[in-house]
């Protein structure tokens, strides 16, 4: 996978995480969900910074960052499930961010 493609995908994850964060702020959701979405958004921003400042050759570092991003997405999804009845817009936004991160992680692992 080309570095520029990874960067684009990370940007997409960040946009989805940003959407999820806005949806969470607009609705009334449990603190755990709010915190996990915030953490996922911060992780996406960190991944973006890593791409901007990092050397293109540092694949293992990039893989680690994407792995952490996907784990943050997992935690946000779990918090969504734990919250029970959540606004569908929040649920969909969290799901999209999680799916983007998972998909990127799988593609990076395949090479």
Predicted regions and their residues:
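Amphipathic alpha-helical binding modules
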Residues: 77-111
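Heptad-repeat alpha-helical rod positions in long coiled-coil/spectrin-like domains
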Residues: 15, 22-25, 49, 53, ...
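A generic structured-segment signal
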Residues: 23-27, 33-36, 79-83, 93-95
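Amphipathic alpha-helical interaction modules
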Residues: 24-71
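Residue-level signal for short amphipathic helical patches enriched in basic/charged
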Residues: 1, 54-57, 111
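Generic structural signal for well-ordered, non-transmembrane alpha-helical segments
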Residues: 4, 11-14, 18, 38-45, ...
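Short terminal alpha-helical segments
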Residues: 2-34
